[in-house]
Every structure is written in structure tokens, then in C-alpha cells.
A protein has these predicted regions:
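Membrane-anchoring alpha-helices and their flanking helix-loop junctions
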Residues: 1-77, 105-139, 145-159
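Juxtamembrane inter-helical linkers in multi-pass membrane proteins
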Residues: 77-85
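Histidine-centered phosphotransfer motif of kinases
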Residues: 84-85, 89-98
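Hydrophobic, membrane-inserted alpha-helices
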Residues: 98-106
Length: 159
């Protein structure tokens, strides 16, 4: 499998933002910070619902592709090697951006300031996950070359 751990995330903050995203921590946090995203959303009309559901399915498809592309190198807190095939050949964090976009889209029909703040909190967690992962992986020369080739973290030509 060529699944060798090259290095481990060295910072408390890196561990914190990774672990808060998983049970039981995300459930505890989610019970105190409402975020409103859900799997069963209706977008005012059947046409609107269909269009948004197609967008959600496409984003989930890219998310799934990103997950499979990582294969045995998938790890939040260790460097097991750099994955450069699609969709990682387009952006450096395709799973994070797709997951966040799905959450924001499913929030649209029930948007409130409380849910917007909660979703903003979770989006920041994922931004900081990307930040700490990149800081850690940038110790690897192979990742430095990858960053020069794939310039965008989340959305090509934007972020």
C-alpha cells in the first residue's frame, strides 16, 4: 500500500481543528452552536429543488471522488504522501470546499442569523483544518512542488 507515515501534525491547534470535526466533539459543539444544514431540503418550487439537488449531487460526487483519490493516504493528522490526481490536480482541498458548499446550499431554505453564524463557525473550522494541514505538509519538499503546480486551495482562480 506504500502507506508510510512521514510525519505527524505537530501542533495542538492542528489536532484541535481536526478532532472537533468528528464525533463526539462535533455533536457536542453542534448542540451549542446551531448550524441548520440538513439532508431534506425544499427550495420553494419543484424546479428550484431539482436544480439545487443536482448541484448538491455533483458536489457530493466530487467530494466522494476526492475521498477515493486519497485512498490509503487519507489522514487528517499525518503526512502519508502527497496525492496529486483529480480532483487534487485542480484544487488542494476539494473535499473541504465541496462539503462546505453542500452545507451552505442546504442552509438556504432555513437561513437565519443563528444558522449563518453557526455555519460560519464550521466553515472557519474547515478553513483552519486546511491551513494547519498545509503548514504541516509544507515541511515536505514534494508538497512544496505540488503547491507551486496547484495554486488554488478551494476554488480555481478565486481562493
Amino acid at each position: 500500500l506504500k502507506n508510510v507515515v512521514k510525519s505527524v501534525e505537530p501542533t495542538f491547534f492542528g489536532w484541535f481543528v481536526a478532532l472537533i470535526s468528528y464525533p463526539p466533539f462535533n455533536s457536542i459543539t453542534g448542540s451549542r452552536i446551531p448550524w441548520g444544514a440538513n439532508d431534506h431540503v425544499f427550495f420553494w418550487t419543484s424546479t428550484g429543488t431539482t436544480i439545487f439537488h443536482i448541484i448538491i449531487i455533483l458536489l457530493l460526487g466530487v467530494y466522494l471522488w476526492a475521498t477515493f483519490a486519497l485512498g490509503p493516504k487519507a489522514s487528517n493528522l499525518t503526512n502519508r504522501g502527497i496525492v496529486t490526481k483529480f480532483p487534487y490536480s485542480i484544487v488542494r482541498h476539494p473535499a473541504y470546499i465541496c462539503k462546505n458548499l453542500v452545507w451552505w446550499i442546504t442552509l438556504i431554505p432555513v437561513m437565519s442569523w443563528q444558522f449563518a453564524l453557526g455555519m460560519g463557525f464550521w466553515s472557519m473550522i474547515y478553513f483552519f483544518r486546511a491551513f494547519t494541514e498545509e503548514r504541516h505538509l509544507s515541511q515536505d519538499e514534494e508538497y512544496k512542488k505540488y503547491k507551486k503546480k496547484v495554486k488554488w486551495k478551494f476554488i480555481p482562480k478565486l481562493i
